[in-house]
Amino acid sequence: MEDFVRQCFNPMIVELAEKTMKEYGENPKIETNKFAAICTHMEVCFMYSDFHFINERGESIIIEPGDSNALLKHRFEIIEGRDRNMAWTVVNSICNTTGVGKPRFLPDLYDYKEDRFIKIGVTRREVHIYYLEKANKIKSEETHIHIFSFTGEEMATKADYTLDEESRARIKTRLFTIRQEMASRGLWDSFVSPREAKRQLKKDLKSKGQCEGLLTKVSHQTSQVSTTLEPMWMDSSRMATLRASFPKCLEK
């Protein structure tokens, strides 16, 4: 799974996911399913934001890569992918500037057009179940929730999907492609089932002679990938800003 993640996702997303896991004391080489899930979630958040701007009349517009957007404001502020302290700094700054209420939990994005925080979810389960879990945890009408699944389903607060249909279709297509690529490499079942992931992890580590002292609580697998899945296009300037938001000590 680790090799698949490194070949499937944009290198900057992989780097941010590694830093995020290390920030919480997690090892992406062992907890590979979580590594894949974090990369997927980050990519969806960035795809949600990419190409969306606000013009001088306050209208939301879409600008494709290569078109001039120097004088336009990004519609979405990306919070996901920053280290925790920086993320809360951004949230506090937005709250002070806009007057919106401060969320209890870190959101993933802020929508300057609708003046609301957004929590993005990507689930391997039923979308309505995952949506209810998120809603019960957040318990705030000020944070908008938008859930995507790997099967093309989605669910959002008050059925308000924020983005146009084409933008959402890009995200759904990407998630479906990731699922298909995982399945073709025999990785999907363990990605969905913690029990299967735990069994596969033990098997893989044993074959590498790394099973000594392994905590059986770990529920993620490591596997090998030989082919490459095309990484998505990324807004490099915004990604560079996110990379810079992590303290240098996390590089160790």
From Swiss-Prot:
The places in or outside the cell where this protein is found are: Host cytoplasm; Host nucleus
Q: Which domain of life is it from?
A: Viruses
What processes in GO biological process is this protein linked to?
Answer: viral RNA genome replication; viral translational frameshifting
User: Which Gene Ontology terms cover its molecular function?
Assistant: RNA binding
Site (described: Important for efficient shutoff activity and nuclear localization): 195, 198-199
- Where is this protein chiefly located? host cell
| InterPro entries tied to this protein | PA/PA-X, PA/PA-X_sf
Q: Which UniProt keywords apply?
A: Decay of host mRNAs by virus, Eukaryotic host gene expression shutoff by virus, Host cytoplasm, Host gene expression shutoff by virus, Host mRNA suppression by virus, Host nucleus, Host-virus interaction
Active site positions: 80, 108
Question: Which residue positions does UniProt flag as site: Important for efficient shutoff activity?
Answer: 202-203, 206
Q: Which family does it belong to?
A: Belongs to the influenza viruses PA-X family.
Briefly, what is this protein's role?
Plays a major role in the shutoff of the host protein expression by cleaving mRNAs probably via an endonuclease activity. This host shutoff allows the virus to escape from the host antiviral response. Hijacks host RNA splicing machinery to selectively target host RNAs containing introns for destruction. This may explain the preferential degradation of RNAs that have undergone co- or post-transcriptional processing.
Q: What is known of its domains?
A: The probable endonuclease active site in the N-terminus and the basic amino acid cluster in the C-terminus are important for the shutoff activity. The C-terminus acts as a nuclear localization signal. The C-terminus is recruited to host protein complexes involved in nuclear Pol II RNA processing.
Q: What is this protein called?
A: Protein PA-X
Q: Can you name the source organism?
A: Influenza A virus (strain A/Swine/Tennessee/26/1977 H1N1)
